[in-house]
Structures are given as structure tokens and as C-alpha cells.
Amino acid sequence: MLDKHGRKINYLRVSVTDRCNLRCVYCMPPEGIVKKEHDNIMRYEEIFKVVKSASLLGVNKIRFTGGEPLILKNIDKLIYNTSKISSIKDIAMTTNAILLEDRVEELKKAGLKRVNISLDSLKEDRFKSITRGGDINKVFKSIEKSLSIGMRPIKINTVIMKGINDDEIDDFMNLTKEYPISIRFIELMPIGEGRKLYKDGYISSEEIISRHSDLIPVETDKSSTALLYKFKESKENIGFISPMSCKFCSGCNRVRLTSEGTLKPCLHSEKEVNLKNYVGNSQALLSKINEAIYNKPLEHHMIEEKESKSKKMMYQIGG
């Protein structure tokens, strides 16, 4: 369906849990989070009702996120049932891949089309520091397994932080020359824990691109959040997601369901609609989703205000 600004909204990002097995420095506090009561989070059946209702309003792309979505025991069942909705054409997942190696085959059989893997360093010690304890070898094994079973495309999402991992930019780019893997560099945002790092850690996509004169622009879909490039010898592309330096609101086609059951029409707006109260009434649920999509804000104002208006943390929203 169209929002009141004429944008076609066909993409729903679903945060199935706010829990995670890592505590990345820009996402979670060092002490982790307090586990929510079961009644305060969306159950599998409730999530599926929202997905089903959204599909009736023109949503045909679903991405499951977290926290870490693979913590959810029924994620394969959720993917399978989603794949049986005839109007859903694309089912993706964003994961840290710590648990992916043992589950990627069943997920692909269930209907998962592609994965984005959050990976902010290729160095074992640095990865452990950024994630506060993560084992990078589990991520590498998951990538290898995903490639071996033909999961395509595989994208690596990398949040670039000045003085922390910006010296690895070339290493990440060069992966596209060796493997059929896409890279997405994401600008650090002043949201949640990222506020603490933003002043000293922010580096713009433009600055990175300007250092690499051999990058070749690639035609990009209007609704894409990334500007795409590649090297002459690349197997896949290199994308730059630039919410701070070059916002993409005019072509935004997505809304987000949080693990608590609120629908966020804009990642960086405090406006959201509680859907959990309506999952028992299909007509009311459809009406509330329709209302939220129609009233999606025209744009965020992070560039001007240097801060997200969202009161939620990234692990609660799913990015």
C-alpha cells in the first residue's frame, strides 16, 4: 500500500526477540539486558498474525532480525509458515551467525532466501572486544557452510567506527574479490549505545568512497538503502548505507515490528503503534497496521539534530 506521501510500503522487518548472545559496543550495554516477562513480548503465533495481516496490505518482503533471531526456537517454523503466504516473495534474516552453521540448512529448506551477517571485524581479538566475547571462528564457519549449500546472496553488514575498525575497510572490500559475498558498510548512528561512540567514532561513507578511486558505481534500486559500488574484479558489490550523511527517506519502503509488538513506521521516530493489543482481532489488527503505514513520517531529522528520536535501543528494534 501507499503511505500518505505516496511511497509504496512493501517491506516488513520483524524483530523476533530483543535478546542476543553478543553485546556489541554500539548496540547493548556491557551488563546486557534484563529478560522480559513472557507476556511482554510477541509470541510466535502473534508475530505470524502480524506478518499475515501485513501481507494483505501489500507487504511482500520480510526480514527477521533480533536481538539475535536464531535464539528463537521456532524461527524455522515461522519462516516456513511465512513462505506459505503466496504474496510473500522474499524472506531474509539478519544474524550475527554465531548459531548459523548448525541451522542454515534447515532454514533454507524452510524458505529462507538470503542472510545478512553482522560482522564488524575480521580480527579475532578485535571481534571479541567489539562483541564482548564473541568467537569469530563460529562466524567464519557459518559463512563457509552457507556458501557451501548455495545460500545466495550473502551480505556482510559492517558498522564502521573511527579508531576501532576503520583500518579494516580494505580487508572487507577485498572479500568481494575472493568470494561471492557482498559487503555493506553502515555509518555509525547516534541511537542507543551508539550515542556514546558517535562523536569520536563517526566516519562518513563519502570519506571512505573518496579514498578508493577504483570503485565503480553500480545501478541501485530506488528503494535500496545502500549506494552500490564494485571493483572491476569483484564477484559481488560493495554497498554504503548512509543514514547520517545521505538519508534515503524519500524512497523508504519499510516498517518495523519490535519484539514487544509495536510497529515503528520509521526507525528514528518515537512514533509507534501497539499491535500486541490487537492480535486477537484480525480486522482491528489490519486497521492498525494500515493506519501506521499510512502515517509513516516523511523523513527523520538525525542529520540536523545529530540524534535519533527513537527511545528504543537497536537490539529492541532490529536495525
UniProtKB/Swiss-Prot annotation:
It comes from the Bacteria. It is an enzyme of class 4 (lyase). It catalyses: GTP + AH2 + S-adenosyl-L-methionine = (8S)-3',8-cyclo-7,8-dihydroguanosine 5'-triphosphate + 5'-deoxyadenosine + L-methionine + A + H(+). One of its GO terms (biological process) is Mo-molybdopterin cofactor biosynthetic process. [4Fe-4S] cluster 2 binds at C249, C252, C266. PROSITE patterns: MOAA_NIFB_PQQE, RADICAL_SAM. Binds 2 [4Fe-4S] clusters. Binds 1 [4Fe-4S] cluster coordinated with 3 cysteines and an exchangeable S-adenosyl-L-methionine and 1 [4Fe-4S] cluster coordinated with 3 cysteines and the GTP-derived substrate. S-adenosyl-L-methionine binds at Y26, G67, S118, M189. It holds the Pfam family Mob_synth_C. SMART domains: Elp3. [4Fe-4S] cluster 1 binds at C20, C24, C27. Its EC number is 4.1.99.22. Coiled coil: none annotated. GTP binds at R13, R63, T94, K155, R254, V255, R256. SUPFAM superfamilies: Radical SAM enzymes (SSF102114). Pathway: Cofactor biosynthesis; molybdopterin biosynthesis. The keyword Lyase applies. Residues 4-227 form the Radical SAM core domain. Keywords: 4Fe-4S, GTP-binding, Iron, Iron-sulfur, Lyase, Metal-binding, Molybdenum cofactor biosynthesis, Nucleotide-binding, S-adenosyl-L-methionine. CDD domains: Radical_SAM, Twitch_MoaA. The keyword Lyase applies. NCBIfam families: moaA, PRK00164.2-1. Belongs to the radical SAM superfamily. MoaA family. Catalyzes the cyclization of GTP to (8S)-3',8-cyclo-7,8-dihydroguanosine 5'-triphosphate. HAMAP family: MoaA_B (MF_01225_B). This is GTP 3',8-cyclase. It comes from Clostridium botulinum (strain Loch Maree / Type A3). The gene is moaA.
